[in-house]
């Protein structure tokens, strides 16, 4: 944040009062408004500049006085209006008793906001407490609010410098140089205003502003707390169960509570209804996880002067509601007089009826508001004003007196939903503006913060072929006494258009009508007169309309808001659990079907697994078909009539697609997602798998055999063996497309699905053009020849054509080829929270089975087994990457695209950081051996000869009898201690010599260590029978690095003789150890039995034979 440097003032004027404070000290209220007259601003600016220059010439010292951000208060002498302050916070309580001389008046500057927060402290802080944060030429300001709940601004010391004063030229006089300096300051001020505005919005959790209207004197931008509003999906059963489980159910039925909330009237106009006030403002101070804060409903509007008595009642905000913040930024470029601004948030419903809206059927489209809420914005209830050019007289103003209440956005009761004329909705909003009440807006940015809470019972944004539910934020006002007509600047940003929210009324209407009705109803004939052809091009701009008689200019802008329904969280609900079906069909076929999830996002691929196991030998499966059914139903506004989306095709015999739809013998739309069959001909699907090597067109038979039961000379008949199969693939759920007027005529009507084939690049190469020799003319003209024969024969692999895996029980490979298709019409979202527009889906798996007739075994009877389960399609923004928490591997990654594990990360100084200890290591006893358990990160072993622990030993039984320590069958391997390198000979074969012999000893050490770390098998010495492992540095006079020399060079391998090998074999067991019992007399004489370890280990790595152990047992007897 920028620092502020203040001008030098007189020596005795470090705490001087400005003219504003002098007037206030006499009890005269002062109301500096950003809408003050321009003439008075210029006079005050000129007089202030002259006074500053005179004070500088009279020898003012470089005494820095704090710069103060204008604050406004409620109550007191200002009568609740905006109040500007140019004094230090320390003098707030002393300004009535202290009167400085006129020449000691300082030239205050504007403080820049670093972080703005809410505070309940009412004690003002002395300015002397900030002296430790001041530097030469830079000043930090920390001003406390004057009232409880007020906001204040604070400047941090690590901010950039923004100088509005000429400290470096304190002896300068007023001259023509001030004009050039003012231009520079104006440019810097404009850049600073943009940065300050963005930080102001960011501090309140808002995104960057988006321009919706711009011309030469006005720009309107919208900033929201998110690109979309995400409403949670909460089942009534789960909600009631969780409430009872947590003890939060007070006996009130949910339906009764919803009816009570919907029964509150919402009035439109200047007195909006259902204003809500947040009672708990502390962040994170929620009552419990289901009750975050409280809203208070009242019937008062946003007018600060409203004297109506509040009639409030508390409404709980639970986890099902979503808070949303909206900021309207009105940037005025020239002094302009505007009326009050009408801001409306509404949800529009449009439903097209094919045969007309019943019962009258005089019109074909329903158009009404499902919810609506209005605000009145003017120069008295803004939250922040940033002037175009910041000066001592034009300072930033934060309106603390504005207390815009948080309001609950919910559905309008059914009886209050009235039909609207879509051609007059904009005019109706403009006509509600009071032209007699105007305000003069000075150049600058006006920020209006609008908090909203969305109820969970409102519908999400819906896009269907004959219905739309969209959310709009609309702003309307009028510019008074504007000369000339201001058209929208061609270089200015265009209004925001959302591709999924049907932003244009004309495109929406054409999409509604032309998508489904071109084959069901004749289009209206357009007159051929010249006026009819050009009348649509004679309208004015959709954002600005001019009234020539009254001198008023209409300003209108709108911003789309997308509301998305999210799937229920897996942590608190079981609604999104995986689907698993396990059944047996007529004691003939057992099938298992598993589907990963129940809530599926569009444009995603979900794995599915199907397992078929025949129970009888004569069952035959010809085809497996997976599809999704979609049913769309519309209900009239009064819940009296309804019709399905497929009725225009299903109930019109003259429709060219009528027979195609009737052949399906079902009323819903069905989209084929996957099909596996044995013949080329079949139903079109998004993915088609054709099996090539099945026997007798049976998907369960792949290994036939010859029938030898016929003893006659007839040819042998081949019989097929039915066996279980497992099919694994991924189902893709394509998203719908926003159809315009042209594309709506190309695709078939709803209910008839057409597909477009996707070419297979693997087949394209095989069936490519023949290789011709390059011609002489082509060579002379510089054309390159065709690819060589080797390059064209290079195989092409496309993974999307190999996603299906079919496994047979016999292990024989199943040969298939794949076909992929793309539907011309995708799938639509589920709509289960709006009673007038209803859309639901089901996943269906169809098995076509053939089985011999029980009465006539020679005849086959064919069956179609249908398994269906409901699924829910949600927005593509609700995919697993956005809804689920990141995995541990993702969280430990150093960067987004970096695949470096945590163990390879570096600290601040660039040193390699070791991985954190595992759970087993953290809870292990400090005195116990340091053991790296299985599944934990490997730890470099310690080779202290005094540690007699299992760290240097092997728990594997195989390697415990593989030979003594240091023994190797390979003469080329050095006779070193195996415990210090690896015991992988028995498990992974002998160790390569390259791990020991290397031109660089460092590489050899690294390889040896890697081998030692990766080997988890160690000797077991728990019974104290094995000898102490001899370290390498004792037996070979080398460093502890596994017997490798520290000097640069190769390692010399001594020739291992037979005697040395035999001597080293004794190190495996303790000296004198034998499996036979030693007699007392032999012990006294020092004679060791012949059946010692030497005889047992005479065969190297082989264990002792039975004939060697039997004599030992006989000797004992």
Curated annotation (Swiss-Prot):
Any one GO cellular component localisation term in the record: cytosol
Alphabetized InterPro entries for the sequence: Arrestin_C-like (IPR011022), Arrestin_domain-protein (IPR050357)
Glycyl lysine isopeptide (Lys-Gly) (interchain with G-Cter in ubiquitin) crosslink, residue number(s): 191, 577, 651, 712, 794, 807, 1024
GO BP: any one term: cellular response to starvation
Biased segments, Polar residues type: 11-34, 1027-1059
A molecular function (GO) term: protein-macromolecule adaptor activity
Pfam short name (any one): Arrestin_C
Bias type Low complexity, positions: 70-81, 117-130, 501-519, 1089-1098
Keyword terms of this UniProt record: Cell wall biogenesis/degradation, Cytoplasm, Isopeptide bond, Phosphoprotein, Ubl conjugation
Domain of life: Eukaryota
Disulfide-linked positions: none
Modified-residue entries (Phosphoserine), positions: 18, 115, 140, 286, 527, 550, 775, 1035
Segments of this protein annotated with the region Disordered: 1-48, 63-155, 275-312, 486-523, 1016-1065, 1079-1117
Subcellular location per the Swiss-Prot or TrEMBL entry: Cytoplasm
Miscellaneous comment in the UniProt entry for this protein: Present with 799 molecules/cell in log phase SD medium.
Task performed by this protein: May be involved in cell wall organization and biogenesis.
Family: Belongs to the CSR2 family.
The name this protein goes by in its record: Protein ECM21
Annotated source species: Saccharomyces cerevisiae (strain ATCC 204508 / S288c) (Baker's yeast)
